[in-house]
Amino acid sequence: MSLVRRSNVFDPFADFWDPFDGVFRSLVPATSDRDTAAFANARVDWKETPESHVFKADLPGVKKEEVKVEVEEGNVLVISGQRSKEKEDKNDKWHRVERSSGQFMRRFRLPENAKVDQVKASMENGVLTVTVPKAEVKKPEVKAIEISG
């Protein structure tokens, strides 16, 4: 898959057809560029501590009622929601529109040690924090075997 669009006249591969070009665009419903940007714009950090997996998503301007946190297929954490569009007045004259609106969704496959039945989520100052506790790692039990003979 080509990540950078080639435009060099001297590049012998510039005009090759890329069969994967546009594959991911077909997975997202046809929307405006602004809505597509919102879909991909939910930035999420994932860190692992000794006790849990912690996800932090920047969702400025999104109310907690507009966000869903779910675990599906047993171990896939799904963070999704909707950024509401600002109401427009007929008399308004926009000079610049940079804030995106529309749907967003992020999915994360959780490791086997995740306690998916104890997931907690909170939202403060536009930052969603999802905490997934980890199961304690059982240390292998060593059993001494007596040697006969």
Swiss-Prot record:
<dbReference type="InterPro" id="IPR002068">
    <property type="entry name" value="A-crystallin/Hsp20_dom"/>
</dbReference>
<dbReference type="GO" id="GO:0051259">
    <property type="term" value="P:protein complex oligomerization"/>
</dbReference>
<dbReference type="GO" id="GO:0005737">
    <property type="term" value="C:cytoplasm"/>
</dbReference>
<comment type="similarity">
    <text>Belongs to the small heat shock protein (HSP20) family.</text>
</comment>
<dbReference type="Pfam" id="PF00011">
    <property type="entry name" value="HSP20"/>
</dbReference>
<dbReference type="InterPro" id="IPR008978">
    <property type="entry name" value="HSP20-like_chaperone"/>
</dbReference>
<keyword id="KW-0346">Stress response</keyword>
<protein>
    <recommendedName>
        <fullName>16.9 kDa class I heat shock protein 3</fullName>
    </recommendedName>
</protein>
<dbReference type="GO" id="GO:0006457">
    <property type="term" value="P:protein folding"/>
</dbReference>
<dbReference type="GO" id="GO:0009408">
    <property type="term" value="P:response to heat"/>
</dbReference>
<dbReference type="GO" id="GO:0009651">
    <property type="term" value="P:response to salt stress"/>
</dbReference>
<feature type="domain" description="sHSP">
    <location>
        <begin position="35"/>
        <end position="149"/>
    </location>
</feature>
<comment type="subunit">
    <text>May form oligomeric structures.</text>
</comment>
<keyword id="KW-0963">Cytoplasm</keyword>
<dbReference type="GO" id="GO:0051082">
    <property type="term" value="F:unfolded protein binding"/>
</dbReference>
<dbReference type="InterPro" id="IPR031107">
    <property type="entry name" value="Small_HSP"/>
</dbReference>
<dbReference type="GO" id="GO:0042542">
    <property type="term" value="P:response to hydrogen peroxide"/>
</dbReference>
